Curated annotation (Swiss-Prot):
MF term (GO), any: ATP hydrolysis activity
Gene name linked to the record: ugpC
CDD domains: ABC_MalK_N
UniProt topology in membrane: Peripheral membrane protein
Lineage: Bacteria, Pseudomonadati, Pseudomonadota, Gammaproteobacteria, Alteromonadales
Positions that bind ATP: G37, P38, S39, G40, C41, G42, K43, S44
Organism encoding this protein: Psychromonas ingrahamii (strain DSM 17664 / CCUG 51855 / 37)
Signal peptide (from-to): none
Localisation per UniProt entry: Cell inner membrane
Protein name, per record: sn-glycerol-3-phosphate import ATP-binding protein UgpC
Annotated ranges, domain ABC transporter: 4-235
Subunit composition and interactions: The complex is composed of two ATP-binding proteins (UgpC), two transmembrane proteins (UgpA and UgpE) and a solute-binding protein (UgpB).
Amino acid sequence: MSTLTLSNITKSYPNGYQAVHKLSLNIEDGEMVVLVGPSGCGKSTLLRMIAGLEEITSGKLKIDDCLVNNLEPSERDIAMVFQNYALYPHMSVYDNMAYGLRNRKTPKADIQRIVNDTAEMLEIDHLLERKPKELSGGQRQRVAMGRAIVRKPKIFLFDEPLSNLDAKLRVQMRLQIKKLQRRLATTSVYVTHDQVEAMTLADKLVVLNQGTVEQVGTPLEIYDNPASVFVATFIGSPAMNILDAKVTNKGLTLGSSLSPIDTQSLKPGDIKLGLRPEHINIVEKSPWFEVEVELIESLGADLLLYCKTLDCKEMDETDQNLVVRAEGHSKIEIGDILGLDIDQKHLHLFDADTSKHIEIDLKMNDQKELLYA
């Protein structure tokens, strides 16, 4: 088990494009760290630099206290699991898993014990004689994981390993990866663009955007306290609603609607209001504003109401849209006009220019009685 330290890591290409810019990160011994972000944010490039598959332009990469910038991949004691499995098609499952151990001249009896124990842990011990073409996608991924596990590396790297699996298999494999990582207690770095995958797997979540770190924290810390509009809208499904508002001498306004927030600690001007769908309450008489329901998605236990605001138009004179989560059996129909109230503990304000979170102590009037519990 090992620590991983990245100090001002930069990756630049000859054409001037900078995939990663002065990125610093500390990964503790036994920690599962998930790098999440949209395509092109630099997460896979960063993982490849850790593995030694990409050259680091500048900065320092240390495993424990050892600088590894110039070490070959084989010298770093790292195992990597890819999304395409990378299994040898002519070899059996057993031989695929044993391949690295044989190259390291591990005694035959030890190879047999290690492979059998790992296969049993992964629940693929009944597949050891099969070839990859005879396996399902989930089984192939478990073989790829087994091949990495038998090496007992200092660090595991996962590069979107579940991307090729269907939705049901992804859920199953997420659970298995999490259980395995806890059991093995091996330092792990996992790359994904799927924020649900990131939230469920991570001990520490690193949100990347355009080659830089937007925020680092536990999944709940990032969900409850996003540092920017980017993080707020990337983490969470459905995404956080972001509404344009203004701070005036009368208070916080959305168009011509005056909110019940005490804004004495805010500077006058434009501001962005962040509201998660599950933190919006439907009430008989709204202290905030009303919306019209334009679309309803039923998820069984919940309804997702896609709404447009009424009388909340901003400078461009267009309606603002937001999503509200309601109880699954609520009697709500398209075209209904609903009053909304906000759970003050979960209200977020962002600077209109920088999109960064504004830390203030919000004070509001009492919540109104809920119409739809």
